[in-house]
Each structure stands twice: as C-alpha cells, then as structure tokens.
C-alpha cells in the first residue's frame, strides 16, 4: 500500500491539531455546535419555507394582538373572524414547523458527519496508516528496558516512539490543560453541611 511520505514531525503536528480540535469540540459540546450551525443556516439560507414561517409567525402575532385588543362580547363577528384566522395560521405554522424540523434533522446529520470527519476519522486513518512509523527516538539508557518497550508499542523497536504513545500523551496533556483552563469558570459547588441530630 502506498502511503503519503510524511515527515514524522508533520504527523506529530497533524495529530496534535486533530486532538486539540477534538478536545475543543468536547469542551464546547456537539449539541452547541449543531445549534450554532443551524442558526447560521437560518441566517444564510434562501429556503422559502423558513421565510414563510417567519412571516406567518409575525402575522399570527399581529392577529392575536388585534384579537386581544377587542372585546369578544362587543364585536363578536370581528373577534370570530380573527379567531378563525389565528387558527388557520396556527395550522399552517404547524405544517411549516414539521418541514423545518426535517430540514434541521438533515442539517444535524451533516454537522455530525462533518465533526466525525474532522475529529475522529483522521485519528483512525493515522493509526492504521502510520502505526509502524517512528516519530522520534529516545536515547538508550534513559529509561529502563520495560519503559522503552512500552513506549515502542505497538510495532516499533525499543527506543522508538510511535503514534499510539504520542496520541496517548497528547490526549492526556490537552485534556488536563482544558481542565485547568475551564476549572476557574466552572459552577461553584456549595460547601456540604453536616446534618445535626435533634433530640
């Protein structure tokens, strides 16, 4: 199989960036990212059903406002007409909402696929393609033989460090750094209070 001839440091940096991106996605949350993509889609889309939904929603709001302004007892005919119009608009909005929800589901699928392609797929492809690549070497004698053997996992000679160990190390460092950065902004936990016995 022909592999792209990448310098080991290119692999190191690429995997570092992908793992950093993966940690960023985990910190922000996939649902937040999908919601942001949906909001951007709503802003830039020229979809007619979204525009129709917004105009009908505005029309319903105005109709309800007008309906509340008049008395049902004093102007029954006008109030009934407005009530029918509001019911009709509500039914149309419900249909449009179902269409928009289907569009949202398809946008969510695309967002999920894009997140998968950007964060998970490169890691697995790199693990398969570059599992035998020596990323860097450690001088002999720095670590005991069994540590050198562990660092050389899965298929490398002692003294070499491969992609698996590099990914493990980068993941640990990035997740710990993300924790240290997010810890001061985390929600404070109240101090536990000991229950006192009442006799």
Curated annotation (Swiss-Prot):
Keywords from the named record: Coiled coil, Endoplasmic reticulum, ER-Golgi transport, Golgi apparatus, Membrane, Transmembrane, Transmembrane helix, Transport
Endoplasmic reticulum recorded as keyword: yes
GO MF: protein-membrane adaptor activity
Location in the cell: Endoplasmic reticulum membrane; Golgi apparatus membrane
GO BP terms in the entry: tail-anchored membrane protein insertion into ER membrane; vesicle-mediated transport
Pfam families named among the record's database cross-references: CHD5
Lumenal topological intervals: 1-11, 137-160
Coiled coil: 66-116
GO cellular component annotations of the record: endoplasmic reticulum membrane; GET complex; Golgi membrane
Function as written in the Swiss-Prot or TrEMBL entry: Required for the post-translational delivery of tail-anchored (TA) proteins to the endoplasmic reticulum. Together with GET2, acts as a membrane receptor for soluble GET3, which recognizes and selectively binds the transmembrane domain of TA proteins in the cytosol. The GET complex cooperates with the HDEL receptor ERD2 to mediate the ATP-dependent retrieval of resident ER proteins that contain a C-terminal H-D-E-L retention signal from the Golgi to the ER.
Name by which UniProt lists this protein: Golgi to ER traffic protein 1
Lineage summary: Eukaryota, Fungi, Dikarya, Ascomycota, Saccharomycotina
């Amino acid at each position: 199989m022909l592999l792209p001839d990448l310098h080991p440091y290119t692999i190191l940096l690429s995997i570092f960036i992908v793992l950093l991106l993966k940690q960023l996605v985990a910190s922000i949350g996939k649902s937040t990212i999908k919601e942001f993509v949906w909001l951007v889609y709503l802003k830039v889309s020229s979809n007619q059903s979204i525009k129709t939904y917004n105009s009908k929603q505005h029309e319903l709001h105005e109709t309800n406002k007008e309906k509340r302004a008049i008395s049902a007892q004093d102007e029954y005919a006008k109030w009934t007409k407005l009530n029918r119009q509001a019911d009709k608009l509500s039914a149309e909005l419900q249909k449009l909402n179902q269409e928009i929800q289907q569009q949202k589901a398809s946008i969510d699928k695309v967002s999920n696929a894009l997140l998968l392609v950007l964060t998970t797929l490169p890691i697995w492809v790199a693990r398969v393609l570059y599992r035998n690549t020596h990323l860097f070497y450690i001088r002999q004698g720095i670590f005991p033989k069994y540590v050198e053997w562990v660092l050389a996992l899965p298929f490398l000679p002692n003294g070499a460090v491969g992609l698996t160990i590099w990914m493990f190390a980068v993941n640990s460092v990035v997740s710990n750094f993300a924790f240290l950065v997010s810890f001061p902004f985390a929600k404070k936990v109240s101090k536990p209070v000991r229950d006192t016995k009442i006799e």
